[in-house]
Amino acid sequence: FMPVYHYLRLHLSDARADGALSGLLETLRLQDKLARPLTQLSCGEWQRVRLAAAFAQIDPALNPQGRVLLLDEPMTGLDVAQQNAVHNLIVGLRRAGVCVIASSHDLNHTLRHADSVWLMAQGRVVAQGAAASILTPERLSDLYAIPFRQLELDGQPLLTIQP
């Protein structure tokens, strides 16, 4: 069975890859997993390995032409510390000029951090625009057929389901 390190190197051909991977492995706390077979990883560990491979492929130092990163539910299976680490990596890529497109079911994270949103239902875009104008209690209540409300906590919007 393939170990984590070999899986990550499959996605990188540049000789500088080890340097780029080193920071990612530290950020995602994967250094001690490198020799472990992929089949022995937990869901969260496997998610972090796949994210490390994706982030390494788009790393501006290794791929100056890379401009778009597409992530499908990147926070799935991650604890809050790892979610924060992934969020910080995404912010770093955005600052480097990479467009990051991510699917998410976490409405509050999306509301606080997304520049723009495509709200989908049954595989179709039903609304698009700035997160604050799309992720409204009215629109979400209509879409999910449950009552939403928006609160403010420490100056940040918080979507909740009404009791």
Model features per residue range: what roles?
Residues 18-33:
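Conserved ABC ATPase "signature" region
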Residues 37-41:
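Conserved ABC ATPase signature
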Residues 64, 69-73:
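Catalytic Walker B motif of ABC-type/P-loop ATPase nucleotide-binding domains
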Residues 83-96:
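Helical segment within the ABC ATPase nucleotide-binding domain
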Residues 104-105:
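H-loop/switch region of ABC-family ATPase nucleotide-binding domains
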Residues 110-112:
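A short, surface-exposed alpha-helical micro-motif characterized by mixed small hydrophobic
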Residues 137, 141-163:
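ABC ATPase nucleotide-binding domains
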